[in-house]
Amino acid sequence: MPTITLPRIIYPFPSLINQFVTAAHEQNRQWVADFGFITTPEAMARFDRSRFAWLAARAFPHAGFHELCTIANFNTWLFMLDDQCDEAQLGKKAVYLEHVTDGFMNILKHNTPVDTVLGRSFTDIWERMQALGDTAWQTRFIRSMEEYFTSCHWEAGNRAADIVPTVAEYVTMRPYTGALFADVEAIEIIEKVYLPAHILQHFIVQRLVLACNNIVCWANDIFSCAKEARQGDVHNLVLVLQHERNSTLQEAVNETARMHNEEVKLFTALEKLLPSFGAEMDRELERFMAVLRSWITANYDWSYHDTGRYQVKEVEVVINS
């Protein structure tokens, strides 16, 4: 694996962290043990190094303890699903993966039990989420999860057929494969930010959500490109750029960083163009925007400072200061 220089990423937003982060980590490690995700001391040591609760605590800095645990468990579940796809080669078995995700959709839509570790744990999360969100919120969240699972099927089909997506295809699908739209929907129940549909669906708000998603996902692709290149997974913006343009890995990293930085500029510009929806709604919208900003910094801070998941400090990666 060649040595690559990672670009220095700086955001014009504050880095925050929830006061309940340590307690949420303890709850999260107990949760994965109780549901059977972790069965050995070695696996628990790896889990502790991943520090999943820190990502949730940075992204939702003002959430209460119960809400923080709920979203930390949810994001941990997503990582566990991702790992099981890798370990069981589930990510290459498109038809079987559809069967598995159909079970998860039945949990969401009908509260139908699924007697697996992933199924039982997802039911536990969904029961807590249902208690926090009304039916309108639940409908939005279910749609975001359905889109996420559909994007997983797309990736699995590509892997099974040895297809490398084009850059255009990848950029279109990447906001869904990261499941961040589900986390954005969760802002309402986790940080208690209540915005009516006409504000959430306003075209500037929608583009800000997409910009946040792109920034987070493309930064993640930079951090994880070495790991995914080793695993032979092409679903990474750096790697599809390298393939399509026949460039070096470093050139592809640099282009991904340029695209990422342009999206940050767009985000900050669009914030200034948001219309007023009245004093009360403007305050709620500012709280919503604050969580989007927190997600952007949370992803970077967690990836670089907290977790051992992406190994961004390995010798094959040099951070450019």
From Swiss-Prot:
Sequence motif DDXXD motif, residues: 82-86
Q: What class of enzyme is it?
A: lyase
Instruction: Report whether Lyase shows up as a keyword of the record.
Output: yes
Spell out the residues of the site Plays a critical role for substrate recognition: D83, E155
Which residues are listed under the site Plays a critical role in the stabilization of intermediate cation?
F79
EC number(s) given by UniProt: 4.2.3.62
Q: Where does Mg(2+) 1 bind?
A: D82, D86
The record's comment on cofactor binding reads:
Binds 3 Mg(2+) ions per subunit.
Q: Where does Mg(2+) 3 bind?
A: N220, S224, E228
Which pathway, metabolic or otherwise, does it act in?
Secondary metabolite biosynthesis; terpenoid biosynthesis
Task: Tell me which UniProt keywords the record has, alphabetically.
Answer: Lyase, Magnesium, Metal-binding
User: Which reaction(s) are listed as its catalytic activity?
Assistant: (2Z,6E)-farnesyl diphosphate = (-)-gamma-cadinene + diphosphate
Instruction: Output the GO biological process annotations, alphabetical, semicolon-separated.
Output: terpenoid biosynthetic process
| Residues binding Mg(2+) 2, per UniProt | D86
Record-level Gene Ontology MF annotations: metal ion binding; terpene synthase activity
Identify the cofactor(s). Mg(2+)
Please name the Gene3D superfamilies in this protein's record. Farnesyl Diphosphate Synthase (1.10.600.10)
Which positions does UniProt annotate for substrate binding? R174, K227, R309, Y310
Q: Where is this site: Plays a critical role for abstraction of the pyrophosphate group?
A: G178
The family line of this record is: Belongs to the terpene synthase family.
* PANTHER family linked: BETA-PINACENE SYNTHASE-RELATED (PTHR35201:SF4), TERPENE SYNTHASE (PTHR35201)
Q: What is known of its domains?
A: The Asp-Asp-Xaa-Xaa-Asp (DDXXD) motif is important for the catalytic activity, presumably through binding to Mg(2+).
- Reported function: Catalyzes the conversion of (2Z,6E)-farnesyl diphosphate (FPP) to yield the bicyclic sesquiterpene (1S,6S,7R)-(-)-gamma-cadinene via a 1,10-cyclization, which requires the abstraction of the pyrophosphate from FPP to yield a germacradienyl cation. The only accepted substrate is (2Z,6E)-farnesyl diphosphate (FPP).
Q: What is this protein called?
A: (-)-gamma-cadinene synthase ((2Z,6E)-farnesyl diphosphate cyclizing)
Q: Which organism is it from?
A: Chitinophaga pinensis (strain ATCC 43595 / DSM 2588 / LMG 13176 / NBRC 15968 / NCIMB 11800 / UQM 2034)
